[in-house]
Amino acid sequence: MKLAIVILNWNGVEMLKTYLPSVVDYSREDNVQIYVADNASVDNSVKWVRSSYPLVRLILLTENYGFAGGYNRALKEISSDYYLLLNSDVRVTPHWLRPLIGYMDKHSEVAACQPKLLSMKDTSSFEYAGACGGFIDHLGYPFCRGRIFNTVELDKGQYNTPLHVFWATGAALMVRSVDYWNAGGLDDRF
């Protein structure tokens, strides 16, 4: 498989009802599989996914391992060239995967990438969490493209060109599976 889109869930049936449809509708590519990794939810998330989206594969974890622990355990169950860790509250748009897959296929030296994230409240502005990748300034202070402190920029196309960043957001993180595991996965403490 080329790409596994993995959505970590814990008691998030309402988020899945709201956002999973766009992921399913706009991720119809060859060699792409969508997974919901469930962190031992007690709501009816699993039942809803099974009945509403039978082609979405479920990975059922035995307890709530949190973000990093949940992804690490779920990804061990998946064989794929790339993983795309996607928050359950992300709405994707048509053709969102093609630039990510194309870039990673052309740049074997790149371990991970992310799409541009726009705000759900105002799609002309960047999302506060992650926006367009992160940096560390010369004083060691972290900041994101698209946001400085509490000021979020309007999207005027200024970040449409790929750029090497210090980190990519976990809200929509595409990573080469071999590099994910060579790095030891995510730190389970987070």
Spans of model-derived segments:
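Short, acidic, metal-binding catalytic loop of nucleotide-sugar glycosyltransferases
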Residues: 21-31
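Short aromatic/hydrophobic "clamp" motif used to bind/position activated sugar donors
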Residues: 83
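A conserved acidic beta->alpha catalytic loop
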Residues: 13, 22, 38-47, 63
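Glycine-rich, basic loop-to-helix element that forms the pyrophosphate-binding segment
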Residues: 60-78, 88
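Short beta-strand/loop segment that forms part of the nucleotide-sugar
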Residues: 31-40, 59-61
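Conserved donor NDP-sugar-binding/catalytic core segment of glycosyltransferases
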Residues: 91-141
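Cell-envelope/extracellular polymer assembly enzymes that use nucleotide-activated donors
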Residues: 2-4, 33
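A recurrent flexible, glycine/aromatic-enriched loop bordering the glycosyltransferase active site
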Residues: 138-144, 149-178, 182, 189-190
